[in-house]
Amino acid sequence: MKESPFIAVLKRELDRMVSRRIYFASCIVLPLFSIFFMATIFGNGQMENLPVGVVDGDNTATSREIIRMTEAVPTFRITRHYADEAEARADVQRKSIYGYLSIPSGFEAKVMDGKETALTYYYHYALMSVGSEIHGAFQSLLKSISVVPIVTHAVALGINQEEIESFLLPVTTQNHPLFNPDMDYSVYLTQPFFFVFLQVILLLVTTYSIGSEGKFHTSANWLAVADGNIWVAVTAKLLPYSFIFIVMSILANYVFFGVMHIPMDCGFWALNLTSALLVIATQALAVFLFSLFPAFSIIISIVSMVGSLGATLGGVTFPVLHMFAPVYYASYLFPVRHFVEIGQNLLYGNYGYAYMWGNVACLLLFLIPPLLLLPHLKRSLISRKYDDIE
C-alpha cells in the first residue's frame, strides 16, 4: 500500500532533524536553557544589596547612626565611603555604585538647635528599574530619619508614644499590592519573558527549516515527496516542531507554576492551550514572512527583527497603551502581544473568556495569511530563483 504524502514528508523531516545537530540545539537545548535561565535569573525575586555610597561631611554620632540605619535597609549595601560628592558622583556615572547619600557638614548641630537642614540622595535613573528601587528605599529611609529629632524632643517633654504617633502620622495608609503582594519580579516577568524568548526561537527555526530546502537545493525533492501539494508539504514539515515546542511550553508552565509556585488564578489546561496557540500562530507568522521573502539570507534577518520587535511590543516591561499610537496598534500584528494579554487575564484574575476572546480570535487569524500565500511559496520553490541569493 502506498504511503500517504503527509506521512512521507513527516518521516523525511524527522530524518533531517536527527541528522543535523542544529535542530537538537535549537529545539531542545535552547528552550531548556531558557527555562533554566528564567527560573533562576531573578533569584529571590527582589532587588537586594544594591551598591551605594555615603558622603559623610559631618562625622558625628548622628551621622554615624544614619549610616547604620542605611546599612540596615535590605535594598542597600554600602560599598564606598567618600570624602566629597565629586568622587561619589563620578562613581555613579561609572556605575560602580547606583546612588549615594550625602550628609552635610554641621548636620548634627543644626538638628540639635532645631534648625532646618537636609539630607540629600542621588541615584542613577538611566537604569529605571534599579533607580526606582533606590529611590523608593531612600524615600522610606529618610522619612523615618526625619521624624527622629521630633520624637526625641517630644519624649524629653514627657509626651507619650501614642500622642507622638497621632501627631506625626494623623492619617495612616494601608498598602495592598494585588496579585503580587511580595513585590516579586519573578511573579510578573518569568513566564512572559520565557515565551518572548521562545517566539524568537520559533520564528528562526521555522524559517530555517523551510529556507534550508532552497539553500541546500532539496526543495524539488520536498515537493515531490508531498506529491506536489504545498499544504501537505508545509504542515507535515512543521508538525514535529509544533509538537516539540508545545511540549517545551507545557514543561515551562509546569516548572514556573508547579515547581516555583508562582501564583496563578487559572488551571494548567488554560495556560497550556494558550501556549500551544502561541506556538502555532508564531509558526504561521514565520511561514507568512518566508512566503513574502523566500530568500534564505534575507528572511533570517527579517524574522530576527520581527522577533525583537515582538519582544519590545509584547507589553511585558512597558505598557503598550502608553506608546506612540501607531506603535500601539502595530503591536497587535505580533502573536506574542496577544499571548501576553491572555496570560495577564488568566494569571491575575481569570476574568473569563469574555475579556480575552478577541486576543484568542487574533491568534487564530494568524493562520489565514500564510494559507493565502502558499501558492506563491510553491511557485518560488519550483522556480528556485531565490535559492542562490546571498
Where are these regions (language model features)?
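Alpha-helical membrane-protein architecture signal
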Residues: 3, 7-11, 183, 187, ...
